[in-house]
């Protein structure tokens, strides 16, 4: 869990920026998007296979 303590002379904007940075580094939003809907094992395999194909195509170009 990400926590940010605000210092005495620190503004809310800078604390919010630090919080957003910590959330993005921890990958919380990406994880939330991935778990938004249930995904069966078959769907996971298909998604990963498509990603592999896409990466191969990018590396060839």
Swiss-Prot record:
List where this protein forms a coiled coil: none
Per its record, what are the GO molecular function terms? structural constituent of ribosome
Keyword annotations: Ribonucleoprotein, Ribosomal protein
The entry's cellular-component GO terms read:
ribonucleoprotein complex; ribosome
Q: Which domain of life is it from?
A: Bacteria
A Gene Ontology annotation in the biological process aspect, one of them, is:
translation
InterPro entries recorded: Ribosomal_bS21, Ribosomal_bS21_CS, Ribosomal_bS21_sf
- Asked if the record carries the keyword Iron, the reply is no
Q: Which family does it belong to?
A: Belongs to the bacterial ribosomal protein bS21 family.
Q: What is this protein called?
A: Small ribosomal subunit protein bS21
């Amino acid at each position: 869990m990400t926590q940010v303590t605000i210092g005495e002379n620190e503004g809310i904007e800078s604390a919010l920026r630090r919080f957003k940075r910590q959330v993005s580094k921890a990958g919380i939003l990406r994880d939330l998007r991935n778990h938004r809907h249930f995904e069966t094992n078959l769907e996971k395999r298909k998604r990963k296979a498509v990603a592999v194909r896409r990466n191969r195509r990018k590396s060839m170009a």
